[in-house]
C-alpha cells in the first residue's frame, strides 16, 4: 500500500512540484477538515488513558495537529480557502466518520491503530520527497513539515504506544488496514473532484 501511495499521481506531482495549484488547494481544505476530526480522536484517546504518561503522549500529539492546522491556515491565506467552510468529499467523510466511530467506540489499541497509518504515511512521504527537494519547490514547506524531526518523533511515539498495547485482535488489524485504504482514497479525492 505504501508503494501505491508513493506512485500515486498526487504524490508524484507533490514530489516534482507539478501538482496543480487547484488540486493542492482542494487537498489543503480537505486535510484541514480531516485534521479537526484527527484532533478529536486524539482527545478521545487521551480520555481513555488510565496511564498519565500515555495521556501526555496524546497531549503532545494534539499539539502536533494544532501545528499542522497552523500550516494549513497559512496556506489558506495564499490559496484563498475558507477553512471554516469546507464541504468534505466522500473520501474525507468516510475517513473522518471511521476515525471518530473508532475513537468513540473502540479500544485504545483500535484508536491508535486507526491513527498510525496517517502519521506513518505522512512521515514516510515527507522523508521520501525531502530527499530530492530543490530550493524553489512550490510545496517545500509541506514537505519539510512532514520530513521534520518534530513530526518524526510524534510518529515514533504513537507507533511505540501501538506496539506497547496492541493485541493481535482482528479489530486492531482491521482498523489499521482500513485507515491505510482511507489514506489512498484521500489523496485521490482532490484530483477527481472539481470545486
Residue ranges and their predicted role:
Residues 164-195:
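Long hydrophobic alpha-helical segments typical of transmembrane helices together
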Residues 19, 26-37, 64, 150, ...:
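Short, contiguous, pocket-lining structural segments
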Residues 4, 18-48, 67, 113-123, ...:
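Alpha-helical bundle segments that constitute or directly flank the non-heme di-iron/ferroxidase center
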Residues 29, 53-150, 177:
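Active-site-proximal alpha-helical scaffolds that flank and shape metal-associated catalytic sites
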Residues 15, 19, 43-51, 104, ...:
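Short, flexible helix-adjacent loops and helix caps
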Residues 3, 49-54, 170:
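Structural helix-adjacent loops and short alpha-helical linkers that scaffold large soluble proteins
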Residues 1-19, 156-165:
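Short alpha-helical hairpin
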Residues 37, 41, 47, 112, ...:
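Domain-length accessory/inserted modules outside core catalytic folds
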Amino acid at each position: 500500500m505504501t508503494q501505491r501511495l508513493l506512485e500515486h499521481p498526487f504524490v508524484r506531482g507533490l514530489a516534482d512540484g507539478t501538482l496543480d495549484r487547484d488540486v493542492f488547494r482542494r487537498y489543503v481544505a480537505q486535510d484541514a477538515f480531516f485534521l479537526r476530526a484527527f484532533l478529536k480522536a486524539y482527545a478521545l484517546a487521551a480520555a481513555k488513558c488510565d496511564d498519565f504518561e500515555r495521556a501526555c503522549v496524546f497531549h503532545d500529539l494534539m499539539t502536533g495537529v494544532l501545528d499542522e492546522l497552523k500550516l494549513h491556515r497559512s496556506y489558506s491565506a495564499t490559496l484563498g480557502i475558507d477553512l471554516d467552510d469546507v464541504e468534505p468529499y466522500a473520501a474525507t467523510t468516510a475517513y473522518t466518520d471511521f476515525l471518530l466511530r473508532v475513537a468513540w467506540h473502540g479500544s485504545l489499541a483500535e484508536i491508535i491503530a486507526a491513527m498510525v497509518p496517517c502519521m506513518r504515511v505522512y512521515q514516510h512521504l515527507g522523508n521520501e520527497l525531502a530527499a530530492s527537494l530543490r530550493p524553489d519547490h512550490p510545496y517545500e514547506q509541506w514537505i519539510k513539515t512532514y520530513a521534520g524531526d518534530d513530526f518524526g518523533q510524534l510518529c515514533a511515539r504513537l507507533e511505540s504506544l501501538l506496539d506497547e498495547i496492541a493485541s493481535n485482535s482482528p479489530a486492531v488489524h482491521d482498523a489499521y488496514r482500513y485507515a491505510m485504504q482511507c489514506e489512498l482514497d484521500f489523496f485521490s479525492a482532490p484530483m477527481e473532484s472539481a470545486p
